[in-house]
From Swiss-Prot:
<dbReference type="GO" id="GO:0016020">
    <property type="term" value="C:membrane"/>
</dbReference>
<keyword id="KW-0106">Calcium</keyword>
<feature type="region of interest" description="Disordered">
    <location>
        <begin position="1"/>
        <end position="55"/>
    </location>
</feature>
<feature type="transmembrane region" description="Helical">
    <location>
        <begin position="77"/>
        <end position="93"/>
    </location>
</feature>
<feature type="domain" description="TNase-like">
    <location>
        <begin position="115"/>
        <end position="282"/>
    </location>
</feature>
<keyword id="KW-1133">Transmembrane helix</keyword>
<feature type="compositionally biased region" description="Low complexity">
    <location>
        <begin position="44"/>
        <end position="55"/>
    </location>
</feature>
<dbReference type="Pfam" id="PF00565">
    <property type="entry name" value="SNase"/>
</dbReference>
<dbReference type="InterPro" id="IPR016071">
    <property type="entry name" value="Staphylococal_nuclease_OB-fold"/>
</dbReference>
<dbReference type="GO" id="GO:0046872">
    <property type="term" value="F:metal ion binding"/>
</dbReference>
<feature type="active site">
    <location>
        <position position="214"/>
    </location>
</feature>
<feature type="binding site">
    <location>
        <position position="171"/>
    </location>
    <ligand>
        <name>Ca(2+)</name>
    </ligand>
</feature>
<feature type="region of interest" description="Disordered">
    <location>
        <begin position="291"/>
        <end position="327"/>
    </location>
</feature>
<keyword id="KW-0479">Metal-binding</keyword>
<feature type="compositionally biased region" description="Polar residues">
    <location>
        <begin position="1"/>
        <end position="11"/>
    </location>
</feature>
<feature type="active site">
    <location>
        <position position="174"/>
    </location>
</feature>
<dbReference type="GO" id="GO:0004519">
    <property type="term" value="F:endonuclease activity"/>
</dbReference>
């Protein structure tokens, strides 16, 4: 009857036919694998160049890519902000509080009537002016005790490095200079100011510059041998109280540093007058010498200088007329008619 019958389950299939189907499926799989492994050659040079440039661009873009999100993390953001803020704060403090001015002409205009200078007195030129070496920050930043922040003492080292200060509100007797004689009590005022300020640290509240490349300032000093110790003293007030200076009087350019200082200075001058201290010793006495203030002394010296200049110019012109010189003598020989003074 054969191996296949109607009652048997399955499909009617021939063994040879199934083998053929298996061979076809294997051939199909091999063909698909061959297509996948096959890489077609480049079509043109243009296509290859475009693909290479594209790959180069992708490589550069991947190298230049930067991830900014890492800076937004607190572990990176907080130290960066603190470091930047610290640098800006140090620069601000240095420019505003630790900037050193070599001379009075270098002082910034923002300092006048609002800021002060801390420095050490290096020389006293007269009874009302002296020079300081500006030391911004003082001992707190190392001036005087750090090796590289010493105040110079030699005259050559101090050249063009000191601020010339004129005391505000006072006028001291003039020392002898420019051929002029010294005024009474000029030496005493100069010696007192030298002993009071020399080599000491002072604080000068600057008001404005003057025509002599100085800066007018109200100056304060602290001394250990004071009562109470280290009490802040106004140098101008102390000079007026001791009768070593007068209140500055002029038609213009008077600087007191405020109305309160002017009132205080005039009261100190009046007190010295009443006590007849210093240069007020013979003031108002009958038969005593006539009192001459520093302002009156300067005015008298200026008038004497002007009269001396006028007399010297007139004498030089008369000498020129009497002695005409080589050119004049030659002209007289050429022109024999003389002059009007000869009566012709």
């Amino acid at each position: 009857m054969g191996w296949w019958s109607l009652g048997s389950s399955g499909s009617k299939a021939d063994p040879e036919k199934s083998k053929a189907n298996d061979s076809k499926s294997s051939n199909r799989r091999q063909q698909e694998e061959g297509e996948q492994s096959f890489i077609p050659p480049p079509l043109t040079s243009r296509t290859s160049s475009s693909s290479s440039s594209k790959s180069t661009t992708d490589w550069n873009s991947s190298l230049n890519a930067f991830d900014w999100s890492q800076f937004k993390q607190p572990r990176n953001l907080i130290p960066t902000a603190l470091l930047t803020g610290g640098i800006l704060f140090v620069v601000y403090v240095q420019r505003r509080y630790l900037r050193r001015f070599p001379e009075a002409t270098d002082i910034s205009s923002s300092y006048f009537r609002s800021r002060s200078l801390l420095g050490r007195v290096t020389s006293v030129g007269d009874g009302d002016n002296f020079r300081i070496f500006h030391t911004p920050g003082g001992r707190l930043v190392g001036w005087g005790w750090l090796p590289w922040m010493k105040v110079p003492t030699a005259r050559k080292e101090l050249k063009d490095k000191t601020v010339h200060i004129r005391l505000a509100g006072v006028d001291a007797p003039e020392l002898a200079h420019f051929g002029r004689p010294a005024q009474p009590y000029a030496y005493e005022a100069h010696m007192w100011l030298t002993s009071y300020l020399m080599n000491r640290r002072v604080r000068a509240y600057v008001h404005r510059p003057d025509q002599y490349k100085r800066v007018i300032a109200t100056v304060y000093v602290r001394r250990w041998l004071d009562f109470p110790p280290l009490r802040r003293r106004d140098v101008s007030y102390e000079m007026l109280r001791r009768g070593l200076a007068t209140v500055y009087e002029a038609k213009s350019g008077v600087e007191f540093g405020g109305t309160e200082n002017e009132r205080k200075y005039r009261e100190a001058e009046m007190l010295a007058k009443n006590r007849r201290q210093g240069l007020w010793k013979d003031f108002g006495k009958r038969g005593g010498v006539n009192f001459e203030s520093p302002r009156e002394y300067k005015t008298r010296m200026q008038s004497l200088d002007m009269s001396a200049e006028s007399s010297s110019s007139s004498s030089s012109s008369s000498n020129t007329e009497k002695n005409p010189g080589l050119v004049g003598s030659l002209l007289r020989k050429v022109w024999p008619f003389g002059s009007k003074k000869d009566g012709t």
